[in-house]
Regions:
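N-terminal pre-first-transmembrane soluble regions of secretory-pathway and organelle membrane proteins
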Residues: 1-3, 15
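Short, charged, surface-exposed hinge/linker loops at domain edges
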Residues: 3, 8, 23-63, 94-150
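Polyanion-binding surface elements
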Residues: 9-20
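Generic structural signal for individual residues within well-ordered alpha-helical segments
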Residues: 19, 90-93
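Short aromatic-glycine-(Arg/Gly/Cys) micro-motifs in beta-strand/loop hairpins
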Residues: 59-78
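A short, exposed loop/beta-hairpin motif centered on an aromatic-Gly-Thr core
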Residues: 78-90
């Protein structure tokens, strides 16, 4: 266990070094690999958006789809408690994409509160996925829909 800790410590760059060599560190993160950074007892991770997008690739937005009595479509998001309706599936998907992105922005703006709430902590990967995509139409198009039971 101690050997593993020493190996991990070898990967960590000190914050003072990062500050002094900021431009070189940024270039390295963008073109080479992420960095682990330590400031006193705090540890953090610095990467480009491509890397975090790859990590988040395993997270999917899934919905249950309901056909209402008026033939509109309602989508219920499984990962986050969001429900949206539209005249057809495409409109419902777009509405859900907008709702996901709106929630992601609110979550990020109130990150300290939301990320510490036990029922919302698991939303973190979905929040960052939505913020990185930053396009309600793309988010709506990537929804994986299954038929729900009315």
């Amino acid at each position: 266990m101690e050997v593993l800790k020493e190996m991990i410590d070898m990967l960590v760059e000190q914050a003072t070094t990062v500050r002094k060599e900021w431009s070189a560190v940024c270039d390295s993160v963008i073109h080479e690999k992420p960095k682990f950074i330590k400031r006193t007892r705090d540890k953090m991770w610095f990467s480009n958006l491509e890397t975090i997008s790859e990590i988040l690739e395993v997270y999917h937005f899934t919905t249950l789809k309901y056909i209402e009595d008026d033939n509109t479509i309602t989508l219920s998001l499984n990962e986050i408690d969001l429900i949206e309706n539209g005249r057809n599936e495409q409109e419902a998907r777009l509405n859900m994409g907008k709702a996901i992105l709106d929630y992601a922005l609110e979550y990020y703006n109130e990150y300290q509160m939301y990320s510490r709430s036990p029922n919302r902590k698991k939303h973190i990967p979905y929040i960052f996925k939505a913020l990185i995509i930053d396009d309600p139409e793309k988010i709506g198009d990537m929804l994986q829909c299954q038929n729900g039971k009315n």
